[in-house]
Amino acid sequence: MNSPMSPVGELFSMIRIISFLIILSFPILGYTPGKWSHKDAYLFKKVKKVPNKEIVRNGEGQVVYVAEYEYNSDGKLITETYSDKEGKGDGKTTFRYTDGLLSSEEVYDNGGHLVERKDFQFKGRALKKMNVKDGEGRLLIVYSIESDGEGNVFAAEGKNLETKDNESFRFQIDPKHPNVQIQYLTDDKKKGLGEIHFKFDTKGNLVEREFFQGENRRVHKLKYKADGSLESHSFHVKQGDNWILEKTHVLVYE
């Protein structure tokens, strides 16, 4: 489950760490401009060890919501079911596949009503386009995507059909820190909307992503088990000179 956000996801989180011209060596999956989730790997490829549950706690350690995951026989994620801090149902997201490729993602509220639908189009095994529709089927956003056959997104541009706004991104390796890559987010006039710095360890695992937007700064930290599986990830916001813990996600494996 991504954060801080609703189950639908926020626009400016993360995406595949690749520039337009240089293919980098660290595989991060993602299909929406500016969005990343550890679950993307469960949609595009078969992962040996996948979690069956994710527990989210606030800065005080209280459980705020839980996500439970269901997979098909190929190991692909097919259902993500949410419950609130009291254990009551809070909607779900379902995923469908055609010939092993992700074809749609549907978000439902607690009453079972469709809130949002995403349709995916591929060329071969490379994701090329994604259409976002509301619960009534109205087309809201069209994403043009450059990706490879592994689900890794290189570049993308989103066009909002209602506001007529466009948003895109580009990547650049930090020349002083080769294990750090910078994502620049821009609008249709190439005005900077912010940037995100990604830090990797020597094994190629993403361990930190830091967000810069004006005076605002946030950090997302990821922790791994000895076998390389994601153990937990946490979100922090800077207030003055201090970093404040917002929430922590703990993954549960059977």
Pin down the residues of each PLM region:
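Intrinsically disordered, low-complexity segments enriched in serine/proline and basic residues
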Residues: 3-6, 10-11
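Buried hydrophobic residues that stabilize the cores of well-folded domains
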Residues: 31-254
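Sec-dependent signal peptide recognition
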Residues: 13-21
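Short intrinsically disordered, low-complexity coil segments enriched in acidic
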Residues: 1-3, 26
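Hydrophobic h-region of N-terminal signal peptides that target proteins for export
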Residues: 22-31
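Intrinsic disorder/low-complexity segments
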Residues: 10-13, 28
